[in-house]
């Protein structure tokens, strides 16, 4: 569903992926980031009361480009139906730190997971 309806073009992690992401963003494209992934170049922020390596790209884009962040949650229902919840766009103040924004996004992700924990697909160690 994510690839078919939300994000048709998927960009790989890493420096070259970040460059491509930036190029697409500057050309007016919306971007979707899966922030529940463990990243080696991230920041250690609280995630379920433990420090977890977390991408700072959403926070960097919010600060550098005054970009809104729109959290999205997809819930699996019966018979191959899905419910898509689109949250109110988040705007952050110029003086908010990358760490504060990243931590806030982790808190939102925690709430999404706790809403339906059996639907969170987690195959790697975020706390490594």
How should these model regions be labeled?
Residues 15-128:
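Non-catalytic C-terminal accessory region of glycerolipid acyltransferases
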Residues 1-15:
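Membrane-interfacial amphipathic helices and adjacent loop/beta segments
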